Design a protein with these regions (language model features):
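Alpha-helical transmembrane segments of multi-pass small-molecule/ion transporters
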Residues: 1-311
């Protein structure tokens, strides 16, 4: 099976997971309250465990230091995406909570739930290493700048609070880095158990999204033009620009493709969870996730095909 077929197979699995969520809601096996329980499980346990165990098992101290170029690449990516989100927000005349959420949606992609399975299926030997190193920066950015952008514009809520940085995800990153640097290895029973828990993150996150999609006004959301600004800029034009740019840097073709694909991911599902938790407009964020996730079924294979065409 070639890499393009592997990519489309992974996306097909995502679609099936989301359809399962839709069916569960439509048949009333689950309701919106049940979905919130799933979201809490994913964001407070499954996702942190997945990040921790994948980093501990996929990154070694030597390779961590040799992969520092990914930190630089991630920094360049975020700077460019923040600038694009600012310009795009002005173009669509967005204000207040929507302006902040639009920036968050334009910057943070669904790397954890979609990027990891896609990249590791394409590059089974080194893909996890690349994603794990990137995830350190990605999650730190999400839980610093992301928390600020997904907080309500009310001055009290929008004020920076150091305590918001202390959460299951940042703790899992810190513990993982300590394990990598010290060479600590987990007992097999604990390692295998955590792997099983972490493996539930992607299916449950996609089922959650499908269920929420079944609860919202799809027609209303797909008519908002500003969401398609994210699709065009973040998911199509920027990944192509980024792929060409990385071609001029001394990085391997695998890192080049991995980072460009990472930048093309749809809106991170954690954005809507954080928007609801921090008093912003979760429905607006969910609309962005709906549109970009549906479009990603077509944009990700297209982008990957263009990468191969460019060479």
């Amino acid at each position: 099976m070639n890499t393009f077929s592997i990519l489309t197979a992974q996306i097909g699995m995502f679609v099936i997971y989301m359809l399962a969520g839709v069916i569960l809601i439509r048949t009333r096996v689950m309701n919106r309250e049940n979905l919130e329980v799933i979201s809490k499980f994913v964001i407070k346990l499954a996702l942190p465990v997945m990040i921790f165990i994948n980093t501990v098992n996929g990154v070694e101290r030597k390779t961590l230091f040799h992969s520092l170029s990914i930190f630089l690449i991630a920094g360049i990516m975020y700077i460019c995406l923040f600038l694009l989100s600012y310009i795009s927000g002005i173009f669509f005349h967005l204000h207040g909570n929507h302006r902040q959420l639009y920036s968050a949606m334009s910057v943070f992609g669904n790397v954890g739930f979609m990027g990891i399975p896609i990249v590791t299926s394409i590059y089974p030997e080194n893909g996890m290493l690349y994603i794990c190193v990137f995830t350190i920066i990605d999650q730190l950015m999400l839980w610093t700048a992301g928390v600020r952008l997904t907080s309500g514009t009310d001055s009290q809520k929008n004020r920076f609070d150091f305590r918001k940085l202390i959460n299951p995800v940042t703790v899992s990153i810190l513990l993982a880095v300590i394990c990598v640097l010290t060479g600590i290895r987990l007992p097999d029973v604990l390692n295998n158990s955590l792997q099983k828990i972490g493996q539930t993150a992607t299916p449950l996150a996609m089922i959650y999204l499908g269920g929420v999609f079944a609860c919202i006004d799809v027609l209303k959301n797909i008519q908002r033009l500003d969401y398609y600004g994210i699709v065009i800029l973040k998911m199509l034009l920027f990944p192509l620009f980024f792929y060409v740019l990385l071609g001029y840097l001394p990085v391997s073709s695998e890192i080049r493709t991995t980072m460009a694909l990472t930048s093309a991911m749809p809106v991170m599902s954690s954005v809507v969870m954080m928007a609801n938790a921090y008093g912003s407009d979760g429905d607006y964020a969910m609309g962005g996730i709906l549109v970009t996730t549906i479009c990603s079924v077509f944009t990700l294979p297209f982008i990957y095909w263009i990468f191969h065409f460019i060479g």
